[in-house]
Amino acid sequence: MVMSSYMVNSKYVDPKFPPCEEYLQGGYLGEQGADYYGGGAQGADFQPPGLYPRPDFGEQPFGGSGPGPGSALPARGHGQEPGGPGGHYAAPGEPCPAPPAPPPAPLPGAPACSQSDPKQPPPGTALKQPAVVYPWMKKVHVNSVNPNYTGGEPKRSRTAYTRQQVLELEKEFHFNRYLTRRRRIEIAHTLCLSERQIKIWFQNRRMKWKKDHKLPNTKGRSSSSSSSSSCSSSVAPSQHLQPMAKDHHTDLTTL
C-alpha cells in the first residue's frame, strides 16, 4: 500500500472518522460498499492502472550517460503508443522490436535510375528525319543518262562551252566551214563534247558568218532561179508558134 505524503508528514493530524461498521449498520452503504470503498486509505496521487500493461523499463535519470532530453520515454496510462508498426504492443517481458533496416545504398559503378539514357534524346528535342527529295526537285543534266528512265525525253538545257572549247572550234571553222564525219568525231573526242554538240555549233556559226557578210540565202536563190527558168521555157514555144500561124493565114488569103 502506497503511503500518502500527508501521512508521512508529522504535522498532519489524522481526522477522526467513524469506522466502516457504523456506516454498514446505519444503512449508508450498500452490499458492495465495504469492498468497493475499502481502498480509501490509498494516497492522493493514486492513478488507476492503464488499459495496457506497462513495459518494465528502468527509468534512467537525465544525466550525461542517459539519453538526451530529446529522446522520447514511454508514456503512462492511456496515451501509450503502439510498439510496432502493426499495432503490436510489447509485453513487460518482451524486448523492444528492432527498427526497420534502411534501404541499401546504390553501388558507385551502377548508374542511378533517375539518369537518362544517353542514347535517347531529351524529351524537348524533336527527332530529325531525313529530307524527302521529289523527282521534280532533281536537276536533269545533258551528260547524265538514267538507264532506268522510261518516261518522255527530258528538256535539254543550253550547253555552256568553255573558253578553250570555243577557241578550238573557231580555229577549225576558220579553215573548214563544213566538217566531215571523221573530223567531227576527232574534235568531239578532243574537246570532250558529243558529235551533236559539234554539229549544232557549226550550223549556228555558219548562219552567223552569212549574216555578218550579208550573203543571200542559198535556199531562196535556188528556188527563184528555178521558177524563172520554168517561166522562160513556157514563153518561148508560144512566141515561136505565132509567126508560123501568121504565115499560114497569108497563104490562105492569097489563094
Curated annotation (Swiss-Prot):
Compositionally biased region (Basic and acidic residues): 245-255
GO biological processes: anterior/posterior pattern specification; embryonic skeletal system morphogenesis; positive regulation of transcription by RNA polymerase II; stem cell differentiation
Name of one Pfam family that matches: Homeodomain
Disulfides per UniProt: none
DNA-binding stretch(es), residue numbering of this chain: 154-213
GO molecular function: DNA-binding transcription activator activity, RNA polymerase II-specific; DNA-binding transcription factor activity, RNA polymerase II-specific; RNA polymerase II cis-regulatory region sequence-specific DNA binding
Gene3D superfamilies the UniProt entry points to: Homeodomain-like
Summary of subunit composition and partner proteins: Forms a DNA-binding heterodimer with transcription factor PBX1.
Family of the protein in this entry: Belongs to the Antp homeobox family. Deformed subfamily.
Protein known as: Homeobox protein Hox-D4
Natural source organism: Gorilla gorilla gorilla (Western lowland gorilla)
